[in-house]
Amino acid sequence: MKTDIEIAQSIELKPIVDVVEKLGISYDDLELYGKYKAKLSFDKIRAVESNPVGKLILVTAINPTPAGEGKSTLTIGLADALNKIGKKTMIAIREPSLGPVMGIKGGAAGGGYAQVLPMEDINLHFTGDMHAITTANNALSALIDNHLHQGNELEIDQRRILWKRVVDLNDRALRHVTVGLGGPLNGIPREDGFDITVASEIMAILCLATDIEDLKRRLANIVIGYRYDRTPVSVGDLQVEGALALILKDAIKPNLVQTIYGTPAFVHGGPFANIAHGCNSVLATTTALHLADYTVTEAGFGADLGAEKFLDIKTPNLPTSPDAVVIVATLRALKMNGGVAKDALTEENVEAVRAGFANLKRHVENIRKFGIPAVVAINEFVSDTEAEIAVLKELCASIDVPVELASVWADGAEGGVALAETVVKTIAENPANYKRLYDNDLSVQEKIEKIVNEIYRGSKVNFEKKSQTQIAQIVQNGWDKLPICMAKTQYSFSDNPNALGAPENFEITIRELVPKLGAGFIVALTGDVMTMPGLPKRPAALNMDVESDGTVLGLF
């Protein structure tokens, strides 16, 4: 079998102008980045707003192994399969962060014969969105430090600045730094740090903004820190939202590419789901819904993180809610959740599949709490056995959830036809009745407890002293009606990454609450979740190279 990069390089791409023609998009509607990538103009986005709204399919997963369970691959393959059975379909997914690409994941544009192309460009610099977000974020940092240096008219307390610099890399050495050293000419010394770009509030804002004016409004609302009198300081107070929006004026426009089978795809925005809301841009998803009969999108990590945030944070900003949720399961992840060691996941173990099914069952139950029908997709691997697949299908039948085997990695669109047909049938026969998990009018504590009790199945939430102080500050400032964005390990329902399967009656500790007023939510930090990842002992970068003719090697 060829590698992902070898498959991608063997495909003859169509000009993006030809790919999107069937959607009613013309050459004049595009801002081209070469022959195969483009941004969609705001004029076209506004022109299609009066079109009917299509069906929305959300792809999520069970709690994953470190390698991931193939959500992006299944999302792409399902869309290709829907087109194959005659459904006018688009994809709306996130763009990869270079940090994980160079770190543990390698490429992140699907895999096998279910990829978005050109995958090398998408995984590297693409259309420059990550660069623009990084630049806007760091421009704000520079403007804050300049304000301190030039007399600090706003009386910002340099000990209470929340805003950090960012870089689109995994670099643990930058988590804590000191800036402003070198004497009076070089600024005011203070502690600072770097997050990864996709953890920046500006990334979340870009993915939730509906137009330039909304972008500016959200940027102005960012709280960068506090004054000496403990009152908040915003970007609006600094009067620099216009400059930041200027840097982002092109990045806010959705990017158009294609799959191996020519399915048009929006690849736009990429916040992490363990430290942010984990969904692609509202603008891309909404536009796809107006252009196609079916839109397939995904949310990061397991359904306890990405899907919950999609349904509680993103969906209220969309013209419709999901008509179906596809939960991706792999036998290796089920076995891991059933207690099998990572080095034994390729060995047949039917009993471990039975034990690990508790994890999948809980995710199905949780999706149903939102009033949306679920479909299970078994992402097929060569190590899967007939006995394991049979047991999983039997277990799914026992909870009355449709299940299909999908081999889109190996077989492309054809490998997803059965899944596509089942999803279409499920949508037709089981209309969704979407409802949010909680009302925003609940207190901060009540909203967090609702997520912990209903989705994670924990029994108690412990608020550390720092978070209690922050809750009082949030209430005092009138921010307590915002939704909650949980920052939690992706490997477990709990805040302990080693508590696999379906733990119950555990306690979760909230160590910090960070208001993200521009994004419009409050981040609740649990466990040891890092906003700047580190590299593994053997990073994927060690396998990457480029030949003298520019051919890329090693992106999986």
Swiss-Prot record:
> Which InterPro entries does the entry mention?
Formate_THF_ligase, Formate_THF_ligase_CS, P-loop_NTPase
A single Gene Ontology molecular function, please? ATP binding
**Gene3D superfamilies in UniProt:** Domain 2, N(10)-formyltetrahydrofolate synthetase, Formyltetrahydrofolate synthetase, domain 3, P-loop containing nucleotide triphosphate hydrolases
Pfam families xref list:
FTHFS (PF01268)
Sequence positions that bind ATP: 65-72
What are the entry keywords?
A: ATP-binding, Ligase, Nucleotide-binding, One-carbon metabolism
Q: Name one GO biological process term.
A: tetrahydrofolate interconversion
Keyword Ligase tagged: yes
Q: What is its EC number?
A: 6.3.4.3
Tell whether Ligase is among the UniProt keywords.
yes
Biological pathway:
One-carbon metabolism; tetrahydrofolate interconversion
Q: Which reaction does it catalyse?
A: (6S)-5,6,7,8-tetrahydrofolate + formate + ATP = (6R)-10-formyltetrahydrofolate + ADP + phosphate
Origin superkingdom: Bacteria
The family annotation for this protein states:
Belongs to the formate--tetrahydrofolate ligase family.
Protein name per Swiss-Prot or TrEMBL? Formate--tetrahydrofolate ligase
